[in-house]
Amino acid sequence: MKHHEMENNLPAGSDTSDAGGTLGTFAGVFTPSILTILGIILFLRLGYVVGNAGLGLTLLILLLANSISVLTSVSLAAIATNLKVKGGGDYYLISRTLGHEFGGAIGIVVFLAQSVSIAFYCLGFGEALAPLFNAHLSILPQIIAALAVSFLFIFAWLGADWATRFQYVVMAVLVTAIMSYFIGGILKWDSALLVQNWSSSPTSPGFWVLFAIFFPAVTGFTQGVSMSGDLQDPGRSLPRGTFLAVGVSII
């Protein structure tokens, strides 16, 4: 009887008896979220957005997109701290707040979206890597993407522990790439070029088209929710890791 009374007195978000996970905030939420946010859109399409919208409108796009991600993160934190979060990711949270019908419908869409995003990211990886080989082969990006998918399948087959270790390698490469970007911008600073690129291009497809191209870059913060079943304390790790990932990506 005392055991049940103690369980009922625990805060909803702090119950870890059913979590059964081993990952903490950094490995389980922050790392997968930040790796998805700073993904292929940032490296392959941000230049296109800046070149067409200009730096001024690009900053507005960043402000609007990140405002949406911050508000969504607040909602996610409110749900995670008021429920006993278990495995199931987005489906679990939505089904417990809006009902199983909404949870099932949205869960299927999220599953398909994440499946397609794997191919999308691998194709982007192949597109970026193909020019390094100087091979006159039109399907080389697709070949590289297929090899990347096979490589990721092996890690998924081995389990979450191997995938968690590998994501640290990816993060190290990502941090190096971003640092080189900032170092290059400081060393090659050109005020005249900044003024020239501030306004939008006459051939720009429009603000909302460019916003739609860039917006998927800020949606990766929900990736940590998918790891809810592997977290030691989902009620604490999900809001902390999500806010940390969104904050770092904004900076």
What role is predicted for each listed range?
Residues 23-33, 59-60, 99-112, 144-148, ...:
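Select transmembrane alpha-helical segments in multipass membrane proteins
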